[in-house]
Structure formats: C-alpha cells, structure tokens
Amino acid sequence: MAKVISIVNQKGGTGKSACTANLAVGLAQKNMKVLIVDADPQSDVSAGFGYRDCDESNETLTALMDTVMKDEDIPSECFIRHQAEGIDIICSNIGLAGTEVQLVNAMSREYVLKQILYGIKDQYDAIIIDCMPSLGMITINALAASDEVLIPVEASYLPIKGLQQLEKLDRTVDEIRRRFGYFSIQRAAMYQDKVLSH
C-alpha cells in the first residue's frame, strides 16, 4: 500500500511543485510506482508533466472531489493520466479554487481526498500530493490523507526568517494530527546555485 506524502508550505514560490516532480521522478527511477495528485489550482506540476489542457478537462481532481461530495461512485481510474516515466498523475485545474469553497459545507469535508485515494492506494508505492500555498480545506484534506509531510524551504535570508511563520503551520498540523492520526513532518532546505553575470 502506498505511502502518501504531502508537499506543503503556505508560502508560494517555495519549490513545492519542483519538489513534487523531482521526488516522483527519483522514486520512479528506483522502480517505484508513483501517483502525483496535483492539489493546486495553478496546475504547475500538471503542466510540468505536459498537461496544459487541464482547465478544459473534466478529468481532474476538481471533478473527482465534486463526485465524492455529491456522494456518487468514484471512478478514480478514469481520472488518472499515465506517463511513460512510470509516473501517474491526477491533474488539477482552476476549478479547484471553487471546490475549496464547496468543501466548507460538505459532509466529512476533511476526508474527501482520503476517500478518493483509499480505492487506489494499493496500486502504488508512493502517492505525492502537491498542495496549494495555503492552509485551506484542500490542504487540510491532503494532510488528513498523508503519512508524511514535506515542507520545502529555500535556504536564503527571507525564507529562513519566514520559518517563524512555520510555527503557525506546526500548530495547525499538530491539531490535524490529533484529529486524523499521526504523520511525520520533514523540512527540506532547497539550495539554488545562482550564476552572476559580469
């Protein structure tokens, strides 16, 4: 059964999507079967794997979550796109922002994503969720479905200073742990080589 890993940081531009893609490729190169769940309406990780048509598609995480909230059958397999690299992906689109609002009034709102993954976890070694830069209901869903949480942080002055804000995230995650079960948190420092031109 798959280990579910969420890539989370409430700040944008921290490398969550790059971390998601690189982790997925690295695991696939070790002959692991990997599913990426793009849980960010910006769809960067979907686009990074060549899916730039997601805003026009009905086969996205948005449609899957809407299906669960309507208490309809979950045809998860129909929403999974297969890559030659051995990485599958459930794409996102801009409609996920609307789903975030709908989740506020949904039954068992924290478990919608977990319910989606339940039926397909045994097909994968790892499921990696690329979260949006917020602690809204979609991210809460990702955390509730996760075994591990990875928080990418750029190793430079302002992001390191911003680690203080992660204390707030830690408190939120601790509350989610108490409500939904244990998962571990890892912080990853992202180093970027910069080339100065003369």
Protein language model annotation of sequence segments:
Residues K168-H198:
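Acidic, metal-coordinating catalytic segment for phosphate/diphosphate chemistry
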